[in-house]
Amino acid sequence: MRYFLQLQVVNMPEQELEFRGINRKHLGMYFEELGGKQITDDFPYIYKSNEWCGEIVREEELSITSTFKVNSVYIRFNASDDMTLKELIKNYRVKTRRIGG
């Protein structure tokens, strides 16, 4: 049995970003660490808090070379206002930052 959830987002600021090379499950976990609750169990994976909504829209595989492939995950951020959206994206980017050594 499948349940369908319809979320209505009205006049909320929105931005979509692409993240490469990060596991989709980790990207969902970052929303939870920022206070979101997982609403759906399939694409689009939706995470919601009182002031924002994050969606893992889709995942693709990119071929950099014939042997080197990397995942690409598209995430949509919605928030109650511009300031909340900027803060959410800033905090999310901190979690996705990778420092090489």
Q: Where is each model-derived feature located?
A:
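C-terminal basic regulatory modules in eukaryotic proteins
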Residues: S63-G101
